[in-house]
């Protein structure tokens, strides 16, 4: 670790940002979080973190924060994440996920904060033509959400050519589960995450789960996804930060386990775990959804000598359900 271990995090009161914050604090980093708390939750912020409640485009406030101490790197999580909503309100997603992020990062670069870890998405691949996707495969975003993420990826790539910017872009596959110590997890009134919604049904917070389409070209007709435990994803951020702080070159990495599960397979796994059957019904397809998207994450695994700790669907589901019970 560098002698100066100050790290700036946007969206640290959110699901993934809070998990990363807890882990970095455990490893001795000093964390400052910028979060507007519009979608974030103050209760998820580690008490050891310095929370600054403001918009990332509040130029005066952000500049004040950047001048208060020397930050080694910024981890950018802040943004909107609902694919279906982005199809209805594309301008909103481009504004929040690209325009606002660009304004914020420009302020960072002007203040010599030039190392960035960006929270991107596997949705930039669209409907891949192969079983497991590598980082150099064709990009074909199917939603404004994915478009907005790819736009910021391209902005970072362009900036790295012109100024002294180093980045790591992390393309998340489907993030699920909760902190094993139950310090943080996913809080959302309108979540569309399968495992979150299924856990709400399992804990009687919802009456039923809606499967959005069972006519896809997959073995059981439902979409296939690669689920990664949020604590493993947090560890990926830690390894990426350590890598970036050693002045290594910029990189793009997939974040997944390389194993796909259909929606019905996840439901069956949950039923076996609970020894019951959760209620579900078949609904229409959801705009912007991919059919099958599974990672090849060998690039990250080899670069970082990384091994997942929680690569087990049962464990992901157990922690998700435990978190829902805690929220009750």
Where are these regions (language model features)?
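Short-chain dehydrogenase/reductase
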Residues: 94, 142-150, 184-196, 226-227
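Hydrophobic alpha-helix immediately C-terminal to the catalytic Tyr-X-X-X-Lys motif of short-chain
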Residues: 151, 155, 159, 194-197, ...
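C-terminal substrate-binding subdomain of Rossmann-fold SDR/epimerase-dehydratase oxidoreductases
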Residues: 197-328
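Basic phosphate/pyrophosphate-binding loop/patch that engages nucleotide-derived ligands
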Residues: 109, 158-162, 191-195, 200-202
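N-terminal Rossmann-like NAD(P)+-binding domain of SDR-like oxidoreductases, especially those catalyzing
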Residues: 1-178
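Short, flexible, glycine-rich and Lys/Arg-enriched loop motifs at helix boundaries
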Residues: 42, 173-194, 204-225
């Amino acid at each position: 670790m560098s002698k100066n271990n100050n790290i700036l995090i946007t969206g640290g009161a959110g699901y993934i940002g809070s998990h990363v914050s807890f882990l970095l604090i455990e490893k001795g980093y000093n964390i400052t979080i910028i979060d507007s708390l519009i979608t974030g939750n103050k209760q998820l912020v580690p008490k050891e973190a310095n929370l600054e409640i403001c918009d990332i485009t509040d130029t005066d406030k952000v500049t004040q924060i950047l001048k208060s101490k020397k930050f080694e790197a910024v981890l950018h999580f802040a943004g909107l994440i609902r694919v279906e909503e982005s199809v209805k309100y594309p301008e909103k997603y481009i504004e929040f996920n690209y325009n606002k992020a660009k304004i914020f990062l420009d302020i960072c670069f002007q203040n010599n904060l030039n190392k960035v870890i960006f929270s991107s998405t596997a949705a930039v691949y669209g409907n891949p033509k192969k079983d497991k996707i590598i980082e150099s495969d064709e990009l074909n975003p199917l939603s404004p959400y994915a478009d907005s993420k790819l736009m910021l990826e391209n902005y970072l790539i362009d900036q790295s050519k012109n100024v002294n910017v180093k980045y790591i872009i992390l393309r998340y596959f489907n993030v699920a589960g909760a902190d094993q110590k139950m310090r943080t997890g996913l809080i959302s009134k309108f979540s569309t995450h399968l495992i979150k919604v299924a856990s709400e049904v399992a804990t009687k917070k919802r009456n039923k789960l809606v499967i959005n389409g069972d006519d896809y070209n997959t073995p059981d007709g439902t979409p296939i996804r690669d689920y990664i435990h949020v604590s493993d994803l947090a560890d990926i951020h830690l390894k990426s930060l350590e890598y970036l702080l050693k002045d290594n070159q910029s990189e793009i990495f997939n974040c997944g386990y390389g194993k796909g599960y259909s929606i019905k397979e996840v439901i069956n796994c949950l039923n076996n775990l609970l020894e019951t059957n959760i209620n579900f019904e078949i609904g229409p397809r959801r705009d912007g959804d991919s059919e099958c998207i599974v990672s090849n994450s060998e690039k990250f695994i080899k670069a970082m000598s990384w091994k997942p700790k929680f690569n087990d669907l049962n464990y992901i589901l157990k922690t998700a359900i435990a978190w829902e019970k805690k929220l009750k």
